[in-house]
Amino acid sequence: ILQSSFCQGLAARSLEESEPLLKGQSIVLADDHIQFVDTFNNLTSRMNDDSYSKLDIDEIIRELLQIRLEFAQLAISAVNLELKLQGGRAYATSSASSRRFREAAFLPIQAPTEVQLKWILSQLK
């Protein structure tokens, strides 16, 4: 849950920073932003769902691991959207966007890695 929360926070910040940049030519990316916000809201709702008490332990583990995987994928997508909208200034090493980019780049290899999560989920089906 803690790792999901980190990914959730990273995605939230990138989506927040991206929204005011959706103007002019960049408006062509508005649908991506809307989709990511919808995914964010859905994942947040699933993570905060109080119906877990009705599930068996394997179902709870499967759902939490799936949420962790999906939040990591969303964070990477949200940060990439922010970078596209920021343009070259996003890559300045002192920028918050650059820091989020480095954090998102680490997510697929953060233990449990994306490969490990997918493997575990495949075994739990």
Go through each PLM region and give its residues:
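Functionally constrained cores in energy, signaling, and assembly domains
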Residues: 3, 8, 33, 50, ...
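Glycine-rich beta->alpha junctions and the first turn(s) of the following alpha-helix
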Residues: 1-41
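Generic structural signal for short, solvent-exposed loop/turn connectors between secondary structure elements
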Residues: 20-33, 48-61, 116-118, 122-125
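C-terminal helix-coil-helix/basic helical segment that borders enzyme active sites and/or dimer interfaces
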Residues: 23, 41-73, 80-92
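Generic structural signal for well-ordered, non-transmembrane alpha-helical segments
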Residues: 9, 34-41, 65, 69-76, ...
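Glycine-rich phosphate/cofactor-binding loops in nucleotide/flavin-utilizing enzymes
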Residues: 89-125
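Predominant activation on well-ordered alpha-helical scaffold segments within soluble catalytic domains
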Residues: 8-16, 72, 76-79, 118
